[in-house]
Structure formats: structure tokens, C-alpha cells
Amino acid sequence: MTLFGTDGVRGKAGKKVSAVNTMRLAMATGIYFKQFAKTNKILVGKDTRRSGYMIENALVSGLTAVGFDVIQIGPMPTPAIAFLTENMRCDAGIMISASHNPYYDNGIKFFDSEGNKLNRSEEEKIEEIFADDDALEDAQVTGKYIGKSKRIDDVIGRYIVHIKNSFPKSLSLAGKRVVIDCANGAGYIVGPTVLQELGAEVVVVGDEPDGFNINEGCGAMHPENLAKVVLDKRADIGLALDGDADRLVVVDEKGETVDGDKLMAVLAVHLKNTGELRGDGMVATVMSNQGLEEYLLEHGITVYRSAVGDKNVVEMMQEKGVNFGGEQSGHIIFSDYAKTGDGISSALQALAYLVSTGTKTSEAFNPYESYPQMLVNLPIEEKKPLESIEGLEQLMEQVEAEGMRHLFRYSGTENKIRLLLEGKNEKALETMMDECMDFFKRTLV
């Protein structure tokens, strides 16, 4: 039984992510982590969705039923859960969030005692326990062995101090006007607080969560709204987080969205110049533009490509011995400060570069010409194994014969197939994308 997608368990709250399934998953997770338990504590945080209350209570029920104590810390960014799990010496951490998805979805992400996301092997073991009725029945405890839960509301300060330490002490944001869009999500307190404490003049939008407005017309998925505020307020930069604040999208002072690959490219070169880039390399995903790779190669930096998902980026970073990586979509990891994508920490790295170089945002993050790319998210009815789709191999050969790079993959969280084409001729890309869409509509829709 497959529960986990590219980033934990995710689905419609009350359906796939129901109270019953969540409690069962919590018990399975507790059983798995019992073998490593040292403090018998598991940390639980969430974003601002209404369904988070239901899921949080179901998690607490399942975990305490198998003997774990639970610490509930309320709305908090995903990277904060990764940090605080290790900082507070918990045996595991759990984040309730569906990231950039609409409010009616929710999800559950798991971290080990060191703040690392679980690998596929660990997820499979939890899935096996989840499906084993006898294992779940036998693991339930009674009497004094049943766990307890408590809520702690002041741990946010630990994370704020940690994040601020990623910003050079020799620099200040004084004189910078920054607009931050918190997506009515988990970063609505931390993001503005950190920027203000570092000296910036801060304009905040998307900081009034009501349980239903997370990501709704705001945040990293809607930078056009941030752009309007940046222009209206004559700000130096705009920063957009997603619902769980593990992603960053930057808007320059002209209201233009900064390409995620170009942001990573500039930061990678800056880190190398300051002696902070380990291994003269970085990890990007198969979605990143070829222009990124060519630009960094000119600066003596090797680009390693992982599968999509910040978890896969982190695993390859560890494998290659590098401390910087990320995704075009805005998940950026600087592992000296965070073990997962961290939108606020990434924002501070970008701001530190602007302050130290004295450049405008529009001038700083446009270091090369990108290859034309087209990305389409095509809704589908079923996810057939790609290798079983008749005619797909011939289609890919046709794409390659046109001198284009392609990536066809299913979304790990939605019923969609993502179609990426990259090449030198934009018109040819459009024509080929039409052919690809027609093909997948015939075979999958």
C-alpha cells in the first residue's frame, strides 16, 4: 500500500487524510520510531488550515495510544519543525501541511530525530505497519504507559534566533523596504518578525489566516499580487512564502518575478566567493534550466541533478558532500542552517547578497540567458506506468531529434502529469508541447 508521495502523505482532508487514517498512520509511525526512542517525545506542528485541528488531534490520539508523549507547538513553518525536533531532543517531528495546495487539502510530513525527512525505505516500513491490523492492535498500551500531550506556545523564539543567525552579523537590513507575502500560512509570524528585528522596513501581506484562505490568491503561487504591492510601496524587494514557508519566490523592485534557477545561481557563486560553498558544487533537479548548469560551470561549480522534491535534493547533497541546493520552484537548501527547504532562511541569503554588493534586485539576479522552457501541468484521470504507455518512447525520440530536453513525470501530490520541454527555439517548443499534450490527453485523460 502506497501512502507517501514526493513529500509525505497528502490528499483531501476528511477523505484520504481523514481522522481515522491519520490516527492509524500515527500509530504506525509511533511503532516504527519506538525502536529508536531515547526521550519518548514527538513534536507536532501545523500550518493554518482549519483541518489541522482534526489531524492534530488524530495524531495525538494515535501516538499516545502506542506510548509516546506529544509536544504540540501550533502553527510553525516546516523547516522550524525540522530544526526544533533536533533542538528539543525529540525522537521524531511531524508537520501537518499540504504546502502550496488549497485549504481543503492537507498532509503530514515526518522528520527523524536529527530533523531529516524520511527516506523511501523508512516510508515503506511505516506503510507496512499501517496495513498490519495485528501490529497496530498489539502495540496499543494501557494504564500508566499511555502517553500524554502538552502544548508549548513559546518555542517560536528558538527558531527566530536560529534563523537570524544565518544572516551575517556584520550586515543590517536598515534602509531596505521589504514586502513579505506570508500566504496566510505558517510563516505569518516568523517571517515579518525576523525581517523587522534585522532592521528592515517591512510591509506585510497575507498575514491574516482564517483557516480557509491559505495560498488563496497570495503567496509563492501568486507572485503577481506581491508585485503590485512592491510597485505601490516602492519597495526594494518582494518575498513570497508558500503555505508552510519552505518555499521562496522573489519579486524585484520593478515587479518582475525572479527566476528560481537564477536566484540559486547567484547565491551559489556568492557562497563560493565567500568560501562557504562546500565541494565546489550544488544540487539542482531535473527541472532546472540548462542555462544554470552552463553558467555555474563557467564559475567552477559543478551542478548535480536529483529527482524532483527537496527531500531528493537533500539526499544528493549529502551523497555529493555539498551544502547548497534547491529547486527552480523555490525550495532552496543551505544545509549549514537548514535541513530542508526554508523560505525565510533563503530570503535572508538573498538579502545578505544585496546588502553586501549594494546592487538592486533586478540587477543582481539575472546573470545569464535561460534556455526557453515550457511547463504544463495536465490534469489526468489515472497514473498509468509511463513505460507501459504505447507510443511514448517514439514521442520522446521525436522530442530529442528536435534537439530538445524533456521531462514527463506524474505529480506526487495531485492527479496531474507535468510536461517539461526545453530547447533553443520557443516556437518549436510550443509546437512540440501541443503534440505532447495531445498525446497524453489521448492516453491518460
Swiss-Prot record:
Gene3D superfamilies: Alpha-D-Glucose-1,6-Bisphosphate, subunit A, domain 3 (3.40.120.10), Alpha-D-phosphohexomutase, C-terminal domain (3.30.310.50). Activated by phosphorylation. Keywords: Isomerase, Magnesium, Metal-binding, Phosphoprotein. Its EC number is 5.4.2.10. The active site is at S99 (phosphoserine intermediate). One of its GO terms (cellular component) is cytosol. Its cofactor is Mg(2+). It catalyses: alpha-D-glucosamine 1-phosphate = D-glucosamine 6-phosphate. Mg(2+) binds at S99, D242, D244, D246. Pfam families: PGM_PMM_I, PGM_PMM_II, PGM_PMM_III, PGM_PMM_IV. GO terms for molecular function: magnesium ion binding; phosphoglucosamine mutase activity; phosphomannomutase activity. One of its GO terms (biological process) is carbohydrate metabolic process. The modification Phosphoserine is found at S99. Binds 1 Mg(2+) ion per subunit. Catalyzes the conversion of glucosamine-6-phosphate to glucosamine-1-phosphate. Belongs to the phosphohexose mutase family. PANTHER family: PHOSPHOGLUCOMUTASE (ALPHA-D-GLUCOSE-1,6-BISPHOSPHATE-DEPENDENT) (PTHR42946:SF1), PHOSPHOHEXOSE MUTASE (PTHR42946). This is Phosphoglucosamine mutase. It comes from Sulfurovum sp. (strain NBC37-1).
